[in-house]
Amino acid sequence: MAGGSPAAKRVVVYRNGDPFFPGSQLVVTQRRFPTMEAFLCEVTSAVQAPLAVRALYTPCHGHPVTNLADLKNRGQYVAAGFERFHKLHYLPHRGKDPGGKSCRLQGPPVTRHLCDGAIGRQLPAGAPSYIHVFRNGDLVSPPFSLKLSQAASQDWETVLKLLTEKVKLQSGAVCKLCTLEGLPLSAGKELVTGHYYVAVGEDEFKDLPYLELLVPSPSLPRGCWQPPGSKSRPHRQGAQGHRAQVTQPSPKEPDRIKPSAFYARPQQTIQPRSKLPTLSFPSGVIGVYGAPHRRKETAGALEVADDEDTQTEEPLDQRAAQIVEEALSLENQPGAGAAISASAPALPS
């Protein structure tokens, strides 16, 4: 790490009130967590707390930790929300219990980490360890597995030599081995079997999404990265199955449900508007167009009744039909017959 910058700290966080939670290991750096609030948000995801983590306590005495500077390297803490601290035996036991089952060893336990690629496993003494190594700055080549014996893990120069032969970096020999967060390792005892690391040469560590792009999701433990769109596939299949069920009419109601290409909702029948109720007026009221009182101008005036000489004009369609006798009136006039016979042409004999 560059001089002057604060060193990274490894802490283990337990879940408040859960004695069976194995703990989650986190790497705390000033660059990754500039504030205490950012660190508490990461702790919430790491311990899978049902509510947001708002406080950290020491597991033995329950003293609150309010500043990142108060965190100690390889320290152990309990994450809690707004509830009170539950004093339980969070730290792992040493040795074996009376039932014969092995218990966790004292010290920072190796547990699942959201940024790591696998779950650390404690192997028997003398058993070889397996680690997965990425190439620094290479987002094309998948990680390779490296088997380290117990003797090789104790010599760090031997580990770097094996990495140089296996990795074959373009920059040359492997100078250091870093975690996915960029924290360089200096001894083989810091390696955890099953975890992912980055081999770095003479250049600087490149913080890239190695795990998200180069590791398939089935090989990752639960809670790690998943490729985008994988969660939506079952939903899409379920939606298609639901559509198929909707389009197929049920045998009980073959006439009511009809298949539709657009899966539209059935339209409701528009009910006709009811007729307006007939207005009923109280006695003495003519209607809405009739004035309740007589006007002052017409006070004392009498209504003129119609007589036989009153002429009225009726519409044509309402008049009574009349017979017009024009031919009879011409015959009754004197000299009309002679005029008619003179105007008629003479017929040939």
UniProtKB/Swiss-Prot annotation:
Low complexity bias spans: 334-349
A Pfam family the protein falls into: DCX
Keyword hit for Repeat: yes
Example of a GO cellular component annotation carried by this entry: microtubule organizing center
Top-level taxonomic group: Eukaryota
Any one of the GO BP annotations: intracellular signal transduction
UniProt keyword terms in alphabetical order: Repeat
Gene3D superfamilies per record: Doublecortin domain
Domain Doublecortin: 9-91, 129-211
Record InterPro entries: Doublecortin_dom, Doublecortin_dom_sf
Annotated stretches, region: Disordered: 222-258, 329-349
Keyword Repeat included in the entry's annotation: yes
UniProt-recorded name of the protein: Doublecortin domain-containing protein 2B
